[in-house]
Regions:
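Short Lys/Arg-rich basic patches
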Residues: 2
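A short, structured beta-strand-centered segment in the mid-to-C-terminal lobe
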Residues: 9, 103-119
Length: 179
């Protein structure tokens, strides 16, 4: 994927998501829609899913920078003895981390969540402008997203927003609460 395709995808999908969420009444935007992967008492709204994607995009930008400066892109996930953590342990820590971010931003007006997302998206586009074509095709060892390249993962931010919108739209909370 080249830089033009990446920028188009990022902008098109961000606009798609903002149009849908921006048209929603506040009560619908903030209504619990999905179950937390971390806290059995917590529920996620469309707004929570939206701000979650900002956290991941910010984290991926840091990963790209580490990788391109010769550091390990993916942060090592090791136990105290130096052996790799299990996937269950890794996912539990990721879910706790994202739940903490969700709680930190819960109840904020949607326009504030958009502003936070705009700041991170600006960083993403600035990074895209700084990267060479070779940088965009550089593979991040162990990265499970997209094709594993910096450019592919960067473009996957767009897919991530649509994926979370879809999960919130399914609304398993209402189904579970129905008699």
């Amino acid at each position: 994927m080249d830089r033009i395709e990446i920028e188009i995808k990022l902008n098109r999908d961000r606009a798609w998501l903002l149009e849908r969420l921006g048209e929603m009444p506040t009560d619908e935007l903030m209504m619990p829609r999905t179950f937390s992967e971390h806290d059995p008492e917590s529920r996620w709204s469309f707004a929570d899913h939206f701000v979650h994607t900002t956290l991941i995009e910010r984290n991926w930008n840091a990963m790209f920078r580490r990788h391109l400066t010769g550091e390990q892109g993916l942060e090592p996930r090791l136990r105290g003895d130096g052996s790799p953590q299990s996937m269950d342990t890794i996912m539990a820590s990721i879910h706790a981390w994202t739940e903490e971010w969700k709680a930190e931003h819960s109840g904020k007006p949607f326009i504030e969540l958009v502003r936070i997302g705009q700041a991170v998206r600006a960083e993403t586009l600035e990074l895209l402008a700084e990267l060479s074509d070779e940088d965009l095709t550089s593979k991040i060892p162990g990265a499970p997203w997209a094709d594993g390249t910096v450019g592919g993962i960067m473009a996957a931010n767009a897919d991530h927003g649509r994926m979370h919108y879809g999960w919130a739209e399914e609304d398993p909370v209402s189904t579970a609460d129905s008699p």
